[in-house]
Amino acid sequence: MARRNFKVLYVSGESSPFVRVSSLADYMASFPQALEEEGFEARIMMPKYGIINDRKFRLHDVLRLSDIEVPLKDKTDMLHIKVTALPSSKIQTYFLYNEKYFKRYGLFSDISLGGDHKGSAERIIFFSVGVMETLVRLGWQPDIIHCHDWHAGLVALLAKTRYAKHDFFKKVKVVQTIHNVYRQGVFPSKAFQKHLDPEVCDALDMEGGEVNLLATGIKHADLVTTTSDRYARQLLDDPELSFGMDKALKACGDRFHGILNGMDTRQWNPSSDKLIKKRYSAEQPEMKLEDKKVLLEEVGLPFSEETPVVGVIGSFDQYQGAEIVKASLAKLLELDIQLIVFGSGDKEFDQALKETAEENEEKMAFRPEFTDAFYHQMIAGLDILLMTSRIEACGMMQMFAMNYGTVPVAYAGGGIVDTIEEVSGDKGTGFIFTDYTPEALTAKLQEALALFANRERWSALMLECMGRDFSWSTSAGQYAELYRNLLG
């Protein structure tokens, strides 16, 4: 008898190319496809933020998925679904939309991130209940609901409480994956008590009048995973690194697993990438120089083959390198490099970077606005990718970079060291600094620059990077085994 294809729903707050804030978006763009190749039927649900361009991504309405009722404790709101396929795949991606909750707003935010989180608790409640109601209307019955980060923690709880009695969800299993442990979805409990029944509220992870949605997802999931085995061990052993999640994770026992990220080697392939100007391969690495020229022209910096171009990419907050980038700028600009910073932080960070770039217009460029096309062009055109996150569960950007012959210089946080082999003699793929200080960062970058000056050795390093296998093949197989064991 042929084995039935199990159905897996992936719930996330972001996914490339539709909207990107963190590496979670890159993960969502490739991981479901890898699991389809393992014999699972995958679909995705995420919010339809107002910033997502319907025309660009070919989102279309589905008549039978319009006017879905989302029953809350104190009211019933209406939900509308738009759908498209994940690019280069047949994976259906469903966008949950309500004008009041999503038209004028960006991504979800919470207390821990500061900024404007007003209304986010109500939005996440609406989205989470909406996911469950959409599945019922759709008639697509998942075997597993795979929840990603705090954005989907409430979905895990709803599946195990309010909807557990529903015939449609009686057999469903829940997996919760941690990508960003310091982003935990912390909110005052008031909105949850207002909009959710006592049965659900009583099961929330709550302390001091605040709800923690990541902890809620961990508590109620059948399996909990994170994006590298090393990072999983660190979360269990280091309360500071886990931001207080170590107790919840220890309580999981053998339900907690670390599986290394992979990458989509079709989407991120310099020989076939449609988003870069000049394609190249390990057989023609010299063509990468053309992408360097294009990148520098795009940001308004002069081209020199001998001057290394160093890039920093991120959503810069206190854990993703905002402070160390600002503190290192003066020293970095003393080096014989050109520097491109791509991504934004708070207003103070953006203003400081903008002013520094204007004062050093021959050496530095700052691009705060994210576009997928520039992201690819930057990965292709850089000589060195400088990774400044203090906490990185695994990351995928260093994998993209190495696949394009761009050498990473990274802080040894989380699972980074599972994917970058420190350069030693003729071996290795990158440079890792272990002290999170501007001095250590600059010193390690200078090691890379010294090697860059030796063109023969640098070319060999580029080829070593491009020869590594970062595909999902191994990791997807590990997830497939977890899924099948969970389903019995």
UniProtKB/Swiss-Prot annotation:
Gene3D superfamilies: Glycogen Phosphorylase B. ADP-alpha-D-glucose binds at R20. SUPFAM superfamilies: UDP-Glycosyltransferase/glycogen phosphorylase. One of its GO terms (biological process) is glycogen biosynthetic process. Pfam families: Glyco_transf_5, Glycos_transf_1. One of its GO terms (molecular function) is alpha-1,4-glucan glucosyltransferase (ADP-glucose donor) activity. Pathway: Glycan biosynthesis; glycogen biosynthesis. It comes from the Bacteria. The keyword Glycosyltransferase applies. It catalyses: [(1->4)-alpha-D-glucosyl](n) + ADP-alpha-D-glucose = [(1->4)-alpha-D-glucosyl](n+1) + ADP + H(+). Its EC number is 2.4.1.21. Keywords: Glycogen biosynthesis, Glycosyltransferase, Transferase. Signal peptide: none annotated. Belongs to the glycosyltransferase 1 family. Bacterial/plant glycogen synthase subfamily. HAMAP family: Glycogen_synth. Synthesizes alpha-1,4-glucan chains using ADP-glucose. This is Glycogen synthase. The lineage of its organism: Bacteria, Pseudomonadati, Chlorobiota, Chlorobiia, Chlorobiales.
